[in-house]
Amino acid sequence: MLKKEQLTVESINDGISKTFSQAFRFLAHHELRKNRTFMLDLGVSILKKFLIDSRDYKVEVVQDFCSRSLTDEFKFKFTSQPIDSKSESDSASYIRNYLGPEGIKQFGGSNWWLYRKSPLKSWWIERRHHIRHNLKCDKVIFYVHGGAHYLSTVRTNAYHIQRHTAALGARTFAPDLRLAPQFPFPCSLHDVLSSYLYLLKSTKPENIIFMGDSSGAGLIVASLVLIRDSKLPLPAGVVYDSPWVDLTHSLPSVVADDAADYIPSEGFHHRASRYWPITNLDSFSTISEKELLNYSKKQELTNFIENSIRKKIQTIKNLIPVLQEMDKEHARIDFDNVDSRLDPNILTTFPFQVQFYTSNANLKHPLISPIFTENLGGLPPSLVLGGSGERLRDEIVYIAHKMNTDVYNGKRTKVRLEMYDDCCHVVTALPFVKEAGIMVRRAANFAYWCLKQHDSSFVSPNKHLDGNPSHANEDMVRLRISRNGEERLMEPKDEIQCLNLPKSALGTIQVKALIRWIDVELILLSKDTKKPARYFAEFKHADLNGYLVKPKEYTMEGENPPLSALVANCKISPEKKQ
């Protein structure tokens, strides 16, 4: 069995090996690679190898490894701040009102997502230099970390959060999020909104800048729409760093062969475990209790479930030739008009859950994939950052333009879009990368400008900022930034592929992306079907026989939590666990 200690050692060894091999490749082919920086290439290579190697480990092992603290305690002070129950309760009410009765039913109820294994807290982050010299600042960065909705913590993301804190010269307030699959949507959204409501009790909204990276930036879009529609006060400005806003992966760059990114083209995968016992938990909810009760013995139930898993694997194997034929035609799967070669109900019958964060049927919900939000107008001034080498570049460009096109109560969203040449996903997280430093400084200068619109007397402690970004008075600024920080105007909209796709393509499944995802998942499943069957059989046997101990929030009337939450957070009564 693979242990988490092995993951640490093997990752370090692989990283060292990769460092030397990449160094020699750079020296040997410098002229061929002169448009890329060595440290950027190196960082991408190490992260990509880690994400691919981590597939052979259980999701909870990788989560534990990715929760290591990377704080600089010498330069920064981290102070935990519990969030009060009133903020949590008010946040839950706003989410329920936004979802409405149908939405609440769609996501399994109005209470299960209030359950926590530990109290909600956020982190205050301050430079020790400011504390020593009593340099008080009432401006706050509200930072939401990324990690594909299932990895990382505030302290793991500390490297780039600290950089943003220092660059603006403000304090940072960053919530620790509950992670999928143990805590799927809307758990992390509730954490973000609760923390913001708490912050508003001590900080004026015009003194707050929202920042986030990747899935955290996507959460910010969803949160701001909810805040806007709930008539709550909006912050002074927003910085989105490589926002992940389309969990259907419907835009072309996701499958592009020219991506210079560490995000694998096959998506995220991990071996089965007690927290993720079978790849698509929801597909087993279709097995009736009557059918399961035919298997009174745990081993009989295990055998039945293992056979079911094997049948589902075979179903997918039979589907591959059809998908390969469709891929030759550059086809897409449109769930409103499914190709006649496929099951018309493929969205619900496809026996794999593609994202840890939510079921396949919910991927297009606007609070999960904000690119499908009907109206993104009327939001605070927004800086949208991305790299021309990342897989998510199309959705980054698309949502920036949508924000500025949509009109909400007569207002568009003022948008500044900056795409950095050759950069990968969330390049600010990579150390010693020149482009990352440029991006952090430009983000701080934009945030400074936003804050000065409400408080002209504010002076950032960072003397390198002037609070006057280029084209500041324009409603929509579209720039490409070179590796040296030089600006040039982005090409016309009609020359950008993702802005000229038919609207019907948005939210459809690219067959090439699906094939790549299936190929990796089948490899993992083929390694072992007995363990996932045993894990799930233990859970179902306990549930059917009345000795599964559930959190009280899961047992309230009308609650039907996602199975990934159930298997992770319910306990089998110890005296019955034989």
Swiss-Prot record:
This is AB hydrolase superfamily protein C4A8.06c. InterPro entries: AB_hydrolase_3, AB_hydrolase_fold, GDXG_lipolytic_enzyme. It comes from the Eukaryota. Keywords: Hydrolase, Mitochondrion. PANTHER family: AB HYDROLASE SUPERFAMILY PROTEIN C4A8.06C. It is an enzyme of class 3 (hydrolase). It is found in: Mitochondrion. The lineage of its organism: Eukaryota, Fungi, Dikarya, Ascomycota, Taphrinomycotina. GO terms for molecular function: hydrolase activity. It holds the Pfam family Abhydrolase_3. GO terms for cellular component: mitochondrion. The keyword Transmembrane does not apply. Its EC number is 3.-.-.-. Belongs to the AB hydrolase superfamily.
